[in-house]
Design a protein with these regions (language model features):
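His/Asp/Glu-rich mid-to-C-terminal helical/loop segments that flank catalytic regions of hydrolases
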Residues: 103-117, 257-287
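Alpha-helical metal-binding/catalytic segments enriched in His/Glu/Asp
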Residues: 86-127, 132-134, 138, 280-282
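Flexible, glycine/charged-enriched surface loops at secondary-structure junctions
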Residues: 56-66, 109-115, 148-157, 218-232
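Single conserved hydrophobic/aromatic residue that forms the stacking wall/gate
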Residues: 1-8, 12
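Active-site-adjacent substrate-binding region
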Residues: 40-61, 169-264
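Glycine/charged-rich beta-loop-alpha catalytic/anionic-binding loops adjacent to active sites
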Residues: 74-86, 258-261
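A glycine-rich helix N-cap at a beta->alpha junction
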Residues: 134-161
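Acidic-glycine-rich active-site phosphate/pyrophosphate-binding loop
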Residues: 60-78
Length: 287
């Protein structure tokens, strides 16, 4: 993608929601023309040839393809002490990975453990791959039927950690945080009792009993943890998929890694917090 030179135009007069327009998010994919042909779209022809040779893609495939454009750099150590991880998409890969590893490393668990890696969270969780669909309820019902019980009985007796990040306190922008109720880098995995917009709008508010259960579990297993809200109440906020699981009558609470620069192309997390998240999920699925 490109950015306008600082000295050109009236970009500084734009309001924040219009700072970058959707139609301005154009990706640079090449500039070299195809040599052995004549025509007006030689650059396009050359790019299509490369895509075809590498991936077998032809132009009509773009109608049905799902493509993901990501920053062209690998995850990096951040800081002179290399204590941080910098990478794109840590919301929510950093929680998905730690959750998945905790489940994969289980050996003959006493209780059934399920890791749900679901889609469309950032766009509302709609569609048949989002958690607002019925696929999870049907999946649990199918599992329950093999034991001769009802799916709703299994759901009502289940517990869930919604593995999602929280915003770490950023001293560069302290005005959007309530410092006494914000997660800190290197403070451990963050337990978030509720999220929502401007308080608890559109939230899942975990019960006091379940929040206490998780607190005792983490303490008993020596997991470093903290609590935090997603910014000041009147500033905004955010949501997770916890509400959609809780709506199935499952005790659910958000647990995840604090992140600096959430949703930026280069998000930052602390390695100790990532380890604490893994330890938290490990303790949960083993108890």
């Amino acid at each position: 993608d490109t950015d306008r030179s600082r000295g050109l135009g009236d970009v500084y007069k734009r309001q924040a929601p219009k700072l970058i327009k959707g139609e301005e998010l154009n990706i640079i994919i090449g500039s070299r023309p195809f040599r052995d042909d004549e025509g007006s779209e030689l650059v396009k022809l050359n790019i299509m040839l490369i895509l075809n040779e590498k991936y077998g893609i032809v132009e009509s495939d773009f109608i049905s393809a799902e493509l993901e454009a990501v920053p062209a750099f690998k995850a990096k150590d951040v800081g002179f002490d290399r204590s941080l991880v910098g990478a794109y998409g840590q919301d929510d890969r950093v929680c998905a990975y730690t959750e998945l590893m905790a489940v994969l490393e289980l050996n003959n668990p006493e209780k059934t453990a399920v890791a749900i890696l679901t889609d469309k969270e950032e766009t509302g969780s709609d569609g048949n791959t989002g958690l607002r669909s019925s696929y999870l309820r049907y999946f649990i019902a199918d599992l329950a039927s093999t034991f001769g019980v009802k799916g709703r009985t299994v759901l009502q007796n289940s517990r869930c950690l919604s593995a999602d990040v929280n915003a770490a306190f950023d001293p560069t922008f302290p005005d959007v945080f309530e410092k006494r109720n914000s997660a800190l880098l290197n403070g451990g995995v963050c337990v978030t009792k509720y999220t929502g917009s401007r308080g608890k709008s559109g939230t899942s508010d975990a019960s006091a009993e379940f929040a206490g259960e998780i607190r005792r579990l983490l303490d008993a297993n020596g997991v470093i943890w903290q609590t935090g809200e997603l910014g000041k109440v009147d500033i905004g906020g955010g949501g997770t998929v916890a509400a959609y699981i809780a709506n199935l009558d499952v005790n659910t609470i958000d647990v995840g890694v604090p992140v600096l620069s959430m949703h930026a192309p280069f998000e930052i997390t602390a390695k100790t917090d990532i380890w604490a998240a893994y330890r938290a999920f490990e303790a949960f699925v083993n108890n």
